[in-house]
Amino acid sequence: MRKLTPGTNIADFDAVRLSIANEDDIQKWSHGEILKPETINYRTQKPERDGLFCEKIFGPVKDINPHDVKFKGMRSREMAVDKNGEVVTKSIVRRERMGHIKLAAPVAHIWFLRGTPSAVGLLLGMTVKNLERVVYFASYIVLAVETAKRDKILADVEAETDAAKQAIEIRYEAAGKEESADIKALAEARTKELEELVANYQEKKDQLQSLERCRILSENDYRNLPEDYQDLITVGMGGQAIKQLLDDINLDALIKELTEEAEGAKGQRKKKLMKRLKMLEGMQRAGIRPNSMCVTVLPVIPPDLRPMVQLTGGRFATSDLNDLYRRVINRNNRLKKLMDLNAPEVIRRNEQRMLQEAVDALIDNNSARGGRAISATGQRRRLKSLSDMLKGKQGRFRQNLLGKRVDYSGRSVIVSGPELKINQCGLPKMMALELFKPFVIGELIAREQAHNIRSASRLIEMGETVVWDALDEVIKGKYVLLNRAPSLHRLSIQAFQPVLIEGRAIQLHPLVCKGFNADFDGDQMAVHLPLSDKAQAEARDIMAANRNLLK
């Protein structure tokens, strides 16, 4: 998030690139660490200090006058001073300032763990199933192997096997020289003993060679390993283990290694390698660190974006995000306490797993593994997570950013108009009058049928005949844009010449329906009016339906 100097033109940019925020980025955004799960003190009705609505971190609830008599106490001054030591007096900062939660143990980010394809899986060359077993403390993962020790043990095992073979050969050779010896029985016994020895050697060799980085070991498998084998490897569990593996990745070296491997690969193997390479090269270009896919510092969004509102009768209605943040803080504080007390490993592991599940539910409650977080109010409904606020028709992008209300626009149901030309659309008279109202007012004044804007507006309200004549005049040669959501490609928005019609539905030529993916079973379309001469020229020359016949 780049700091802008006053007077910077925020519209002056060439492109937007999304990247993964690392620990340092989040701490730069933040104005303080949230330590308590409390929100508002129910006696004083003021935000709790270091809580989810803390005024010191997020700014004052009400605008402050620094010269006011009330603004004297140390507490009041503290809550109004930001981290640069400047006094904050406007409550609007509570829509901008972020906080953070320092996690007691790293957790894997669910978007990168369970996405399709799994980013962490592609980085480490592992399946999502195996990653989940590690992240949720069901299995160990090998973090490092002492190869020199392993090779020495393998050489010792081989030497022992060779010595045992020689001993068997000598023993059976001596037994075969005795007069009463049953040569056939001895040969069978010798062969059986040698086969057992070779099988035992092969088993030990396979077991040693299988101890490599990123190998998954269940609890029983690890416990059943001989002690000297356990000393060869470093194992881990949970988000901490995944973070350590990601820390060790050198993108340049890994890209070079995979490129060489892909040159000699074929078929499905090559396809998998190319998929990994594509993601790794993208991360390298964007300067993304692999360990950013694990969360150690969790950002907390501004309180005015997750409000708490008092209802009549003293009760409070709160955003679901506050409940989800509260779960994370409670579990994080409990884990810190257990670590300070040096609690048994099994208890700490369980608390780390619960912390992982709480962060999963906060980020994406649909994909959370440990059961979806539900409301504690008795309604048993699923809590809305950060992902739910962003995705879908009601999400931040489609509802608030792409779906903003626009002046000089309208919306109506579409019906077939086969008598129209392909570059024409039927526009209801009342809708056209509202869209072209300023132009109609200008035309009425130009014709001297009205002396000012007020008298022209009065004529329009009364529906005088001169108004419709003026409307006919102003729409000549004009183009309007028709858009059908979702706008998936360029043909979702096309320009048409309006033809005034009775009724309330927009008429559309059947032959242009394909581009809009529209049909006449109740679909709705939006109309937009390009205002400037340049916009009209662009609509006429580039966006007109008769100029978009070939895709």
Cite the ranges covered by each PLM segment:
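Conserved core architecture of multi-subunit DNA-directed RNA polymerases
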Residues: 1-551
